[in-house]
Amino acid sequence: MPSATSHSGSGSKSSGPPPPSGSSGSEAAAGAGAAAPASQHPATGTGAVQTEAMKQILGVIDKKLRNLEKKKGKLDDYQERMNKGERLNQDQLDAVSKYQEVTNNLEFAKELQRSFMALSQDIQKTIKKTARREQLMREEAEQKRLKTVLELQYVLDKLGDDEVRTDLKQGLNGVPILSEEELSLLDEFYKLVDPERDMSLRLNEQYEHASIHLWDLLEGKEKPVCGTTYKVLKEIVERVFQSNYFDSTHNHQNGLCEEEEAASAPAVEDQVPEAEPEPAEEYTEQSEVESTEYVNRQFMAETQFTSGEKEQVDEWTVETVEVVNSLQQQPQAASPSVPEPHSLTPVAQADPLVRRQRVQDLMAQMQGPYNFIQDSMLDFENQTLDPAIVSAQPMNPTQNMDMPQLVCPPVHSESRLAQPNQVPVQPEATQVPLVSSTSEGYTASQPLYQPSHATEQRPQKEPIDQIQATISLNTDQTTASSSLPAASQPQVFQAGTSKPLHSSGINVNAAPFQSMQTVFNMNAPVPPVNEPETLKQQNQYQASYNQSFSSQPHQVEQTELQQEQLQTVVGTYHGSPDQSHQVTGNHQQPPQQNTGFPRSNQPYYNSRGVSRGGSRGARGLMNGYRGPANGFRGGYDGYRPSFSNTPNSGYTQSQFSAPRDYSGYQRDGYQQNFKRGSGQSGPRGAPRGRGGPPRPNRGMPQMNTQQVN
């Protein structure tokens, strides 16, 4: 049973009895005999006939192969039935006995089919190669004929020249090439191939007759023409071609042109050295352009770049004048015939002080305005930083006059050139945020940032219970401030340089500020206060803020300053109108406190986020309520700035140079302590807080206040 199934073919089974094995073998032999002459057919027939014949042979073999597969499948069925025990008739038993012969014929037919398919592929390749070869030969013959036609036309045209005719009759080395009769035959044939225009015939018909004459000449036919035959004319033309007469003969007109060109060549060469520019001029011009254009595009500021091109050239090519002059003198020494270089632009020598000032100005511009320094770049050393306490003292008169260049107002920008030894700072970058407002509105003025080279450490010896909030401007500060060219008279604060400032946005470590003294300090302690005292003093705050500044754009001299009273608020503390507080900045931190404020249970954070460097409780107090330091733009009479919890604080409220909108000042259950004052000068007209009696601030510890005389 397994042997019967193993020999089963893939062909379909037929219902009728299988044909005898002898007939199948004869059919295969006939197919092989028919293929034998077909294999010799490609050598005698065309490509198309060979391809068609091969397709027919492959079709016959494929048909016989399908019949053998059907027969083999039928025999497999008979053998399977016999193995199951079924009884078969005699014809079926005879067919089963021929099973091996049918299998052999099937294998032979398959092998024959593979052979003919390979032969067919070879024939196809041969046909393609032959067709390609014939195409190339045909193109080559056509190209050769076309070349011969062009040569014949050229020879016939040149025979009209008397000199050419004489040369052909005399020949080369005394051997004549053509005789007079042959020249006459060529003249007659020329009239046939290049006839004159006959208006009685169409142009197409006239040149059709001429092409027939040329074709017969190229073929060398024996047809008579001009008293001779095309074959004789072809021999005459070939003799002229083989003489190579026209290869060595030059046209006289072309020769004259060549002689004229050769004669004009030396004249051009003589003019070239005269028109050569001097290398010295080109070199100096390139050096000047490269140095000027590179520096102006890379390092010049935008305002100075558009001010004037002549000023930029004088500014940045001053240092390279000596090099350009040396390069100029070398070509002059080598070629004394040139009196002066025309491409060198003379540059005037600038003042050394002005030049040094411009270099320092460039250094400051490359450093960049410190208003754009991010908060993440600032380094904080104090962990209890809190801008809530204002501590101010007048600066020394000697320190106020150290760097007068930095206190010039922006309207006098040309005064930067007055002090060449100082590093100037851009006007928009020297503004320290200060608040200078009145009871009726907000008035912005240009503050003065007065640096100091010496670091002054203030002692902490006074008792802690004396918190003073009055800025006393003494006579020394009045004398120093009146001598400075300023647009307005602001408050001047001083602190140690080791305490960097956070909310001012100034990087004191930058190059323009390394020689200055930082004027802020965040180390003033504040003791806590009791809540009842705070509730008693909430409604006793001053109704107006008496600090005022002059906004004159010109320099004024003030011999005496009024002593202004700065009244500050910590948490819900409000001073009465008759209270006068003075902050001396000499406080002593109590031993029972590690920081200025204890950690509160519910600190308030505004939408800006916490500042870096402080504890969590202290950071919540930095911007926990609305005031001029955290973006409030309303009337100043209802709010007071906050105190700082760090010792020796010299920080005051920020100026509204860029107003900020903090929308989260009423979040996390925070309720403002009081309504806005009557004087509304900010962009918001209606208060956002609730009315009614004020409540103590939930996110801040209370401070004890003490009135001093």
UniProtKB/Swiss-Prot annotation:
The modification Phosphotyrosine is found at Y625, Y636, Y639, Y651, Y662, Y665, Y670. Changing P512L: In CONDCAC; likely pathogenic; results in altered dynamics of stress granule formation and resolution; increased protein stability measured by nano-differential scanning fluorimetry; increased protein aggregation; no effect on oligomerization. One of its GO terms (molecular function) is mRNA binding. Changing S376 to A/G/I/L/P/V/F/E/R/H/T/M/Q: Abolished interaction with G3BP1. This is Caprin-1. Changing R633A: Major reduction in MYC and CCND2 RNA-binding. It is linked to Neurodegeneration, childhood-onset, with cerebellar ataxia and cognitive decline: A neurodegenerative disorder characterized by early-onset ataxia, dysarthria, cognitive decline, sensorimotor axonal neuropathy and muscle weakness. Brain imaging shows cerebellar atrophy. Changing R667K: Abolished ability to undergo liquid-liquid phase separation for the formation of a membraneless compartment. InterPro entries: Caprin (IPR028816), Caprin-1_C (IPR022070), Caprin-1_dimer (IPR041637). Keywords: Acetylation, ATP-binding, Autism, Autism spectrum disorder, Cell projection, Coiled coil, Cytoplasm, Differentiation, Disease variant, Glycoprotein, Intellectual disability, Methylation, Neurodegeneration, Nucleotide-binding, Phosphoprotein, Protein synthesis inhibitor, RNA-binding. Ability to mediate liquid-liquid phase separation is regulated by ATP: moderate concentrations of ATP enhance phase separation, whereas high concentrations of ATP lead to inhibition of phase separation. May form homomultimers. Interacts with G3BP1; interaction is direct and promotes stress granule formation. Interacts with G3BP2; interaction is direct and promotes stress granule formation. Interacts with PQBP1. Interacts with DDX3X. Interacts (when phosphorylated by EPHA4) with FMR1; interaction with FMR1 promotes formation of a membraneless compartment. (Microbial infection) Interacts with Zika virus capsid protein C; this interaction is probably linked to the inhibition of stress granules formation by the virus. The modification N-acetylproline is found at P2. Residues 60-94, 125-153 form a coiled coil. Ubiquitous. Tyrosine phosphorylation by EPHA4 promotes interaction with FMR1 and liquid-liquid phase separation (LLPS) for the formation of a membraneless compartment that concentrates mRNAs with associated regulatory factors. Residues 433-446, 577-605, 642-657 have a biased composition (Polar residues). Belongs to the caprin family. mRNA-binding protein that acts as a regulator of mRNAs transport, translation and/or stability, and which is involved in neurogenesis, synaptic plasticity in neurons and cell proliferation and migration in multiple cell types. Plays an essential role in cytoplasmic stress granule formation. Acts as an mRNA regulator by mediating formation of some phase-separated membraneless compartment: undergoes liquid-liquid phase separation upon binding to target mRNAs, leading to assemble mRNAs into cytoplasmic ribonucleoprotein granules that concentrate mRNAs with associated regulatory factors. It comes from Homo sapiens.
